[in-house]
């Protein structure tokens, strides 16, 4: 049970940090992704 809780906390924290950085600074790498 503890492993599951720690994994969830780790993933959620990384996700929040990733989205915060992504929305604060748009990626400067040119993407050829067409939407």
Curated annotation (Swiss-Prot):
A Pfam family matched in the record: PsbT
Subcellular location: Plastid, Chloroplast thylakoid membrane
GO biological process assignments: photosynthesis
Chain segments annotated as transmembrane: 3-23
GO cellular component: chloroplast thylakoid membrane; photosystem II reaction center
Membrane disposition: Single-pass membrane protein
Recorded coiled-coil stretches: none
Primary location recorded for the protein, binned into one broad class: plastid
InterPro entries attached to this UniProt entry: PSII_PsbT, PSII_PsbT_sf
UniProt keyword annotations, A-Z: Chloroplast, Membrane, Photosynthesis, Photosystem II, Plastid, Thylakoid, Transmembrane, Transmembrane helix
Subunit structure as annotated in this protein's UniProt entry: PSII is composed of 1 copy each of membrane proteins PsbA, PsbB, PsbC, PsbD, PsbE, PsbF, PsbH, PsbI, PsbJ, PsbK, PsbL, PsbM, PsbT, PsbY, PsbZ, Psb30/Ycf12, at least 3 peripheral proteins of the oxygen-evolving complex and a large number of cofactors. It forms dimeric complexes.
Family in the record: Belongs to the PsbT family.
PANTHER family (alphabetical): PHOTOSYSTEM II REACTION CENTER PROTEIN T, PTHR36411
The protein's role, per its UniProt record: Found at the monomer-monomer interface of the photosystem II (PS II) dimer, plays a role in assembly and dimerization of PSII. PSII is a light-driven water plastoquinone oxidoreductase, using light energy to abstract electrons from H(2)O, generating a proton gradient subsequently used for ATP formation.
Name of the protein in its database record: Photosystem II reaction center protein T
């Amino acid at each position: 049970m503890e492993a599951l809780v720690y994994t969830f906390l780790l993933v959620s924290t990384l996700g929040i940090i990733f989205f915060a950085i992504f929305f604060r600074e748009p990626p400067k790498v040119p993407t050829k992704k067409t939407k």
